[in-house]
């Protein structure tokens, strides 16, 4: 029986539980572990392994595969250490899904935008800067701009700059002038990641891709009065049938970032239809076509399961079963 680890941080998380159940159903022996308690021993004694990787009582190097649901937040050195462990396990022959490189590619919004654009995929116009002057120029040039933390998640700490004001994702207007707020953000982050705001019908799309194939999608609709569509920010989910063009760019986005499974966030543009019907992606040159917003390398499967009854965990474990 193949031994697989499932790295989680919240035992009650829907996706974590779904992965554990699917692993058992596929005949795997799942080891549930938390990378935040992982330890590594390095020795030059011939009587001991050169390197010993443990998480609690689990010997990580004995695993056939490791599925990463969550690495866990924390200080820079701690998070970097966990990714080092994943890289070293991978080098030692453990199949890691998603790979540490892919998770980091997806988590870094700036680098993900670069990879997506390099692959010829449509993305919002984007500027990354390290000065307030450059940030003001970018925001002014876009007219309506969004500033996101490069390593943000769940729609937190997103700011929209429009008409001389900054509104944050909690819908409050930022205190101080735009310049003062940008100075504060730059001091905190060291750089600013700025995108044009894409006018849209009050929703975006989360497509789930496994093994290079889009298995389903949902609309994420913003809460009343909000401009942020994340479910974690009060948004709601509904069924979405992807147009062929949207399916194609979602699958290519997962490949461009290096993910085996991923949540691909797509924004449609203001002219999109507002039903659940198949939509056509408009010509990229019009500025109103579908664009890739982000790639999530550790996505939740709950939204698509609630909307469609599609369980991404089953697809992930089936893919893993086929490659081991």
From Swiss-Prot:
Mn(2+) 1 binds at residues 265, 294. GO terms for molecular function: ATP binding; GTP binding; ligase activity, forming carbon-nitrogen bonds; metal ion binding. Residues 274-293 are annotated as: Disordered. One of its GO terms (cellular component) is cytoplasm. Mn(2+) 2 binds at residues 294, 296. Its cofactor is Mg(2+); Mn(2+). Its EC number is 6.3.2.33. Belongs to the RimK family. MptN subfamily. Homodimer. This is Tetrahydromethanopterin:alpha-L-glutamate ligase.
């Amino acid at each position: 029986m193949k031994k697989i680890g499932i790295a989680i941080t919240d035992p009650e998380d829907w996706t974590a539980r779904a992965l554990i159940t699917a692993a058992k159903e596929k005949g795997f022996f799942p080891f549930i572990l938390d990378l935040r308690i992982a330890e590594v021993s390095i020795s030059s004694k011939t009587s001991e392994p050169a390197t010993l990787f443990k998480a609690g009582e689990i010997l990580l190097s004995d695993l056939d595969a490791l599925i990463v649901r969550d690495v866990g937040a924390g200080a820079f050195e701690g998070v970097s250490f966990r990714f080092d462990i994943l890289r070293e396990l991978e080098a030692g022959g453990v199949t890691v899904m998603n790979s540490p490189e892919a998770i980091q590619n997806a988590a870094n919004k700036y680098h993900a935008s670069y990879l997506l654009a390099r692959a010829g995929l449509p993305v919002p116009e984007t500027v990354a800067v390290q000065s307030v002057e450059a940030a003001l120029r970018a925001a002014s040039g876009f007219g309506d701009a969004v500033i996101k933390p490069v390593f943000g998640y769940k729609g937190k700490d997103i700011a929209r700059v429009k008409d001389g004001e900054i509104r944050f994702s909690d819908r409050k207007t930022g205190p101080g002038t735009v310049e003062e707020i940008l100075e504060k953000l730059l001091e905190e982050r060291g750089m600013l990641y700025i995108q044009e705001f894409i006018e849209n019908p009050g929703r975006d799309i989360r497509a789930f891709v496994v093994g290079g194939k889009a298995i389903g999608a949902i609309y994420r609709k913003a809460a009343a009065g909000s401009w942020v569509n994340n479910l974690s920010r009060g948004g709601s989910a509904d069924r979405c049938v992807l147009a062929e063009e949207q399916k194609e760019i979602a699958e290519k986005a997962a490949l461009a970032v290096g993910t085996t499974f991923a949540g691909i966030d797509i924004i449609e543009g203001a002219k999109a239809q507002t039903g659940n019907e198949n939509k056509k992606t408009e010509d990229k040159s019009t500025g109103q076509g579908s664009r890739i917003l982000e790639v999530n390398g550790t996505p939740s499967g709950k939204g698509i399961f609630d909307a469609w009854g599609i369980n991404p965990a089953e697809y992930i474990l089936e893919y893993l079963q086929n490659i081991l």
